[in-house]
């Protein structure tokens, strides 16, 4: 049976270090563990799922551009680019693909510079502070929104 939707997960800088980087803030779950769980969940939901992690802003932007026309929803943890990247915001707006912004930690309970996001006001929603579970909730929400809009 053909997959209903294509959902793209993008992870920004330093998320390749999950599990070992500041586990008190980000948890002990690795990015590979998160992606594996989402792949299993997506398969059960009959959804095509793809993933990219990059420490390079231009790679994330190029991937967003390439998603135009073949991706129904983007899940993105922009990491530090949340607070700095107008270019990432512009790329997401340019392709008109709905997206959910995800953060493992509660950015509002951290340093003041982390309180501002260049993406939040144009996102479908923002999930923060729920650890790795936030990714699962984002995938479930994306599928539900796509299912009810088609």
From Swiss-Prot:
Pathway named in the protein's UniProt entry: Metabolic intermediate biosynthesis; chorismate biosynthesis; chorismate from D-erythrose 4-phosphate and phosphoenolpyruvate: step 3/7
Protein family (similarity comment): Belongs to the type-II 3-dehydroquinase family.
Enzyme kind, highest EC tier: lyase
Protein's job: Catalyzes a trans-dehydration via an enolate intermediate.
UniProt site (Transition state stabilizer): 21
Assembly mode: Homododecamer.
Gene Ontology annotations of biological process type: amino acid biosynthetic process; aromatic amino acid family biosynthetic process; chorismate biosynthetic process; quinate catabolic process
Protein name: 3-dehydroquinate dehydratase
Positions of substrate binding: 77, 83, 90, 104-105, 114
Transmembrane domains' residue ranges: none
Residue positions of the active site: 26, 103
GO molecular function: 3-dehydroquinate dehydratase activity
Reaction catalysed by this enzyme: 3-dehydroquinate = 3-dehydroshikimate + H2O
InterPro entries per record: DHquinase_II, DHquinase_II_CS, DHquinase_II_sf
Database matches in Pfam families: DHquinase_II
């Amino acid at each position: 049976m053909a997959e209903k939707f294509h959902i793209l997960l993008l992870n920004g800088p330093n998320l390749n270090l999950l599990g070992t980087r500041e586990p008190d803030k980000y948890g002990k779950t690795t990015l590979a563990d998160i992606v594996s769980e989402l792949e299993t969940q997506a398969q059960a939901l009959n959804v095509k799922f793809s993933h990219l992690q990059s420490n390079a802003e231009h790679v994330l932007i190029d991937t967003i551009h390439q998603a135009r026309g073949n991706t129904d929803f983007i899940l993105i943890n922009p990491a530090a680019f949340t607070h700095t990247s107008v270019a990432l915001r512009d790329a997401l707006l340019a392709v008109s693909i709905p997206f959910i912004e995800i953060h493992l930690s509660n950015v509002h309970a951290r340093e003041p510079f982390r309180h501002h996001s260049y993406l939040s006001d144009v996102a479908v929603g923002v999930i923060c502070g729920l650890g790795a579970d936030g990714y699962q909730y984002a995938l479930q929400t994306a599928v539900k929104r796509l299912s009810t809009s088609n």
